[in-house]
Amino acid sequence: MQYGFGAPVSGALSAPETLSRVATEGEAMGYDYITISDHVVIPRDIEARYPYSDTGEFPGRSRGDRHEQLTAVAFIAGATSRLRLVTSVTVVPHRPAVLQAKMLATIDVLSKGRLTFGIGAGWMKEEFEALGVPPFPARGAVTDEYLQACRELWTKDNPQFDGKYVKFANVLFEPKPVQKPHPPIWVGGESGPALRRTAALGDGWYPIGTNPQHRLDSMKRFAAGVERLRRLTREAGRDPAKIDLAYRVTNWGRSLPARADDGERRLFSGESADIVGDLRALRDIGVGHVDFNFGGDTADAMIAGMRRFREDLLSRV
């Protein structure tokens, strides 16, 4: 099993020297990948409901000071040599398909094949409006089409595409990504459309357990989600064994309720031994990647937390 940690791309810890230090020290500790989140702008007034809190309030709504995702990925790539770079997640409709494909291919080349393209369709209507991208209600269809266009550009010598939202022909697209056929595509999300997108277009499923509408916060619920994904993948004519499973953890420990609302044990609640048991259970069901958000008011505090977690918990899995 591989373990990742979140990059501080907003607030005081996102200063160049701090961001670089967190990334390089995480790499030196033996973490396998770093995740980088995506918001281009934060609207002052947000009516859209954030999918991963019970209240629907976005925890970062007061912070407009955050780096553009793919620029930050390139910066981290230059500071590290081994860490995989996971976009967590890229809101696919936010960037034109051809430009997005080029930026991602460039990152994969310059990082020597370390990019994982985590993707989502987006949830913040006001951000879509500010960016002037295709309409928010069409985000699912736009995401699917942009992904297909990216694959065309990454894999074909004479790429052509004639879709509703993107069209191109008569283009040379080089260099191609280092990874073949292209960087792995991890599909974020827990809903039916996200599962169908994973089954049809994804190389991995990358959910968060805390979506109130689609909770995956107990092993029973997560196992049911995995089984549904495998069924949809077979229906799409693909091999479920080729779909990687990842899991993103935003909170853990004694502060969490011990039980999910289905009556089962809540994943990542309780003591260290409980969390080690959860990681083993996820591994047994086929999960190959788990990542965590580490807080801290200073770089020293964040790095110390990462080190303790790795030594006290991850080393026991």
Report each predicted region and the residues it spans.
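Active-site-adjacent structural elements that line small-molecule/cofactor binding pockets in enzymes
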Residues: 1-317
